[in-house]
Amino acid sequence: IVIEDNKPEAIESIKNAIRPEDEIEVKVLKTKYPQGAERQLIAAATGRKISSSKLPVDAGCIVDNIDTVIAIYNAVCESTPLIRRILTVTGDAVSRPSNFNIRLGMQYTEVLEGAGGYKTAPEKVITGGPMMGVALFSTDVPVVKNSSALLCLTKDEVAQYEPSACIRCGTNLH
């Protein structure tokens, strides 16, 4: 189990829950962004490099985030299908940034109402994270199983940058 070092309570909690016979290792990584992509995470945690033609399982690894692990547990142990999701609503344009446990299929518009709506008109609304998220042109779309966040950004929060030949391949991060 890999956890970044900026989450000391999670590290302690997981370590206390693991029994020696579980044969589970907790690997604490230095906090670094971006580091959450599968290949980056495997390299940081194990030192193994995976070519783009290979899968994580080829390196003896499975990479799942906590939401996926919980969904697997609920499906296998509780016979509960994936019907809910924790969604973070944040950004300076939203009145009350919050985390919500919502039903899949709920409209982002409804979730925003739960966060008090906009306190100022957003310059950009993104579903997902700031690096890999997707801009929404309307919040009248449903939350789906891979939704994790709704970023409601003001003009000041939206990065202004010059166009460049960079395709964000990540090569210069190593």
Describe each model-derived feature in a short phrase.
Residues 1-3:
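Short catalytic-loop micro-motif centered on adjacent basic/acidic residues
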Residues 5-108, 114-121, 129:
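Hydrophobic alpha-helical positions that pack around
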Residues 12-13, 38-39, 136-139, 162-163:
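Short, well-ordered secondary-structure micro-motifs
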Residues 87-89, 119-148:
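Ubiquitin-like/PB1-type beta-grasp interaction modules and other compact soluble beta-rich domains
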Residues 107-108, 130-134, 157-158:
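Short, catalytically relevant binding-site loops at active-site mouths
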Residues 143-154, 159:
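Glycine-rich and small/hydrophobic secondary-structure elements
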Residues 159-174:
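Cysteine-centered iron-sulfur cluster-binding motifs in ferredoxin-type domains/subunits
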